[in-house]
């Protein structure tokens, strides 16, 4: 199961010196590969989740990585500086955010990105369990992020999936 996650993280083209925010880290499957890549330089990873169970799980999974810190709570309530991250990762989590709160969360994530930073999002698009691609694009655009690239793919478990990269272009 690690290979698809590794390939996805490979698509980030990390040099090892980036500061990365993993929003909704859950079990740390993506986080582990990011932390590993960042060890080659002076990079750092921040893992955020609203679940204490997941934060404890990821801390155990990533205990050998000194370049990781963990934050428990809603991103809207956490003390995280704006313009602090080169990359924000949103992996299969946006559909778990209440619809009426999605724009607020995406706006906050966009503020956390440095100018020229990138937001990578992978999200199921099924009507019953996902976020439509058109909604994802609208959320990102409203937050001031510009689509660099995107594609639709298929996952055995999640069905149709949107993969996108959005840039924070300074005004």
List where the protein language model places each region.
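A short acidic, Gly/Pro-enriched loop at the edge of an enzyme's catalytic core
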Residues: 76-88
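Short alpha-helix
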Residues: 130-143
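Class I SAM-dependent methyltransferase SAM/SAH-binding core
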Residues: 21, 27-77
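A short glycine-rich, Lys/Arg-flanked "PGG" loop and its adjoining helix->strand segment in the class I
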Residues: 103-115
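Conserved SAM-binding loop and adjacent beta-strand
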Residues: 1-7
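A short SAM/SAH-binding and catalytic strip from SAM-dependent methyltransferases
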Residues: 87-100
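Conserved beta-strand signature within the Rossmann-like core of class I S-adenosyl-L-methionine
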Residues: 116-123
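Core SAM-dependent methyltransferase catalytic element
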Residues: 154-171
């Amino acid at each position: 199961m690690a290979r698809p996650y590794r390939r996805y993280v490979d698509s980030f083209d990390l040099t090892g010196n980036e500061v990365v925010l993993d929003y909704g880290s859950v079990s740390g499957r993506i986080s582990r590969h990011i932390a590993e890549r960042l060890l080659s330089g002076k990079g750092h990873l921040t893992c955020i989740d609203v679940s204490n169970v997941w934060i404890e799980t990821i801390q155990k999974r990533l205990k050998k990585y000194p370049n990781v810190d963990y934050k428990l709570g809603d991103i809207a309530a956490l003390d995280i500086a704006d313009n602090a991250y080169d990359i924000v990762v949103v992996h299969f989590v946006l559909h778990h955010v209440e619809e009426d709160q999605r724009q607020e969360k995406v706006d906050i994530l966009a503020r956390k990105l440095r100018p020229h930073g990138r937001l990578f999002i992978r999200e199921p698009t099924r009507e019953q369990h996902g976020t439509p691609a058109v909604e994802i694009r609208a959320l990102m655009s409203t937050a001031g992020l510009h689509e660099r690239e995107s594609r639709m793919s298929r996952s055995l478990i999640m069905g149709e999936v949107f993969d996108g990269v959005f840039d924070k272009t300074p005004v």
